[in-house]
UniProtKB/Swiss-Prot annotation:
Keyword Membrane: yes
Protein name (Swiss-Prot/TrEMBL): Sec-independent protein translocase protein TatA
Native organism: Stenotrophomonas maltophilia (strain R551-3)
Listed InterPro entries: TatA/B/E, TatA/E
Keywords associated with the record: Cell inner membrane, Cell membrane, Membrane, Protein transport, Translocation, Transmembrane, Transmembrane helix, Transport
Any one GO molecular-function label of the UniProt entry: protein transmembrane transporter activity
Name of encoding gene: tatA
Protein localization: Cell inner membrane
Family: Belongs to the TatA/E family.
Record GO biological process: protein transport by the Tat complex
Length: 75
């Protein structure tokens, strides 16, 4: 009563294939795979210390901080 058997899942899969078609399902799976890949890449990049990043990224952060401070000053 609690969980579904393999036959229930096969029927659900068949209905999903009939409703959406294989082309939409493969493109959706491809999009999901690329999203997971980008997420993992972002997590790896986040783990790198700032010393390993190039000078360009540090200068962009400094200019962004200066602009933020300029935007917060009262006029």
């Amino acid at each position: 009563m609690g969980s579904f058997s393999i036959w229930h899942w096969l029927v659900v899969l068949a209905i999903v294939l009939l409703v959406f078609g294989t082309k939409r399902l493969t493109s959706g799976a491809k999009d999901l795979g690329s999203a997971v890949k980008e997420f993992k890449k972002g997590m790896r990049d986040e783990d790198k210390p700032n010393a390993q990043l190039g000078d360009e990224s540090r200068s962009q952060d400094a200019s962004r901080t200066a602009q933020d401070e300029h935007d917060r000053t009262p006029r």
